[in-house]
Amino acid sequence: MCQVCGAAEADLHFGGISCRACAAFFRRFFLSKKQSKKCTCKTRILDSHPCRSCRILKCFEAGMTSKKIQSGRDKTSTKAISCISTESTSNSLSARIIPRSSLNIHGAVHLWQEFENTRACKKGTKRNALIVSTSSAGDMDSTWKMVINLFSSLGELEIKDKTALLRNFMPKFIQIDSVPYFAANIDVFKNIGRDEYESSIIDFYDGVLPETNTISKKDTIRIFEPYWNFYTNKVILPIALMKLEGPEFMALVWLLFFDNGYTNLSDKCREACRNIKKVILRELRSYQIDRNFDRNRFFEILEALQLVERGEKKFMEEMVICELLNIKIDPGFMEIIRESKL
């Protein structure tokens, strides 16, 4: 969907997702000498398009940048053209015609923001073990809508494959869910006091223990703090410190989602996952080349996949302890934790 006017047909243009009409407007705006700087919306008829000033602001909000616009054609003489060497012409054309598309990871950024906003409205600000586990069903529905929006061919998968993909992804999703928020507030989290940290741990399990099996706050810290320390220091913080840009983070999300190493997937589904992962890896590398990032950054993201997998194993261990202590966890979520996938 065009992030400027809302049109259904959209593609990657000048760094943002837009329809061809808005892309053409954006290009004309910078190549034309006429650049309206004042908003004229109040003087226009009710059903007309927004003025040039407002429309260009929407283009910027969609991520479009004038740096990606090729300069206009100059009127050059035949003599001037003949002076250009064949080698330099070939290199120039090669640089322009090789496409570096990153549509899937670019388009997913906006969808992820909508996904997170929807989750925030449903769950509110309070979070504890029961709320997190209970929300997994809604998270799976929203995740699949996002997947189909970008990879429509997966709508042909059998229900069991769709379900398996989502159930395989949920424990990983819980590991990375807080990474963007953590990255945006990293100084706050680095300087959190001991008392506040312990209070967060206690609040997460408070109220989800049956009255007949309460444990002291001291025991809660003793049992669960090692897990929190692991998630924070071994998973969330290392990824947050990478300062991933939106498309890079979405590449990480999709590489985790389309993990084809599970035995509960059909051969057809595993092949689809394998092919999509190739596309995502290619888009990620292309995006980083366009941004002039160091090549090591690509491999750091691949290493982040291993961090999340380690966090997933630790999380499953924590859930088993919660079950032994009769901490209230959604039964459906515990089925996801228990089932054999490898």
UniProtKB/Swiss-Prot annotation:
GO terms for molecular function: DNA-binding transcription factor activity; sequence-specific DNA binding; zinc ion binding. A zinc finger (NR C4-type) spans 2-22, 39-54. It holds the Pfam family zf-C4. GO terms for biological process: innate immune response. Residues 94-341 form the NR LBD domain. It comes from the Eukaryota. Keywords: DNA-binding, Metal-binding, Nucleus, Receptor, Transcription, Transcription regulation, Zinc, Zinc-finger. SMART domains: HOLI, ZnF_C4. The keyword Transcription regulation applies. It is found in: Nucleus. Transmembrane segments: none annotated. Its main location: nucleus. GO terms for cellular component: nucleus. Residues 1-71 bind DNA. PROSITE patterns: NR_LBD, NUCLEAR_REC_DBD_1, NUCLEAR_REC_DBD_2. InterPro entries: Nhr-150 (IPR042936), NHR-like_dom_sf (IPR035500), Nucl_hrmn_rcpt_lig-bd (IPR000536), Znf_hrmn_rcpt (IPR001628), Znf_NHR/GATA (IPR013088). Disulfide bonds: none annotated. Orphan nuclear receptor. Belongs to the nuclear hormone receptor family. This is Nuclear hormone receptor family member nhr-150. It comes from Caenorhabditis elegans.
